[in-house]
Amino acid sequence: MCLHHLRKCRTTNQGLHIRGRWTGIKLEIIPGAEEAQLLCNNLVENTESGVGNFAYVDVGGGSTEISLLHDGVLAESHSFNIGTLRMLAGAVTPEERNAMCRMLEKYAEDFPGTKIIGSGGNINRLFRLAKIKGDSRSLPVATLKQLYAELAPLSLEERMEQFKLKDDRADVIIPAAEIFLLVARSLKCEDILVPNISLADSIVDGIYRDVQGNMASKDNKE
């Protein structure tokens, strides 16, 4: 929830500048769309062709960030006030939920065969709980539905005991699963890609791409 508010706050850049002067360390907030582009570039480079339609879905406590990519290029990016903590507090409005669903359904019509790239600690934990065999990083939506059906009826303590979850994961994992299932239904997706790639890896990869591009441009001029 903190990152969501930092990205929206007008005074964030001023605050980061002041802290940079105090510490000598320059800080920068990466926009959700840029984060999605970095992670998607890294994912498609390591797993498959960049051709195709992807929905990068990052579920947080305060919001769900959805970035839509077509053939490796960012088409549009949206932020919805639908997060795990908001859902637990009953603070998600039907209007916000419907707005997200309508946007996704429209994208599915315009770009059929869209694949979901799931991001965040909850979807990674759900993937591990699913115990997918082999090297696949794809979580079938049917498996997620089954896992949700097992988790949802349990108390917080039962989830912690039976599924070895920490208390701060055992509560938010339920609304997180609900959000991903809602997104999958709206996009008519049967699988969710859960890459084992961190944002730090993707930033380094992005810097490498920039350096390679600058070197190639310099060579062409010479």
Q: Where do the model's predicted regions map?
A:
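Helical "lid/coupling" subdomains associated with nucleotide-phosphate turnover
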Residues: L3-N53, L68-E222
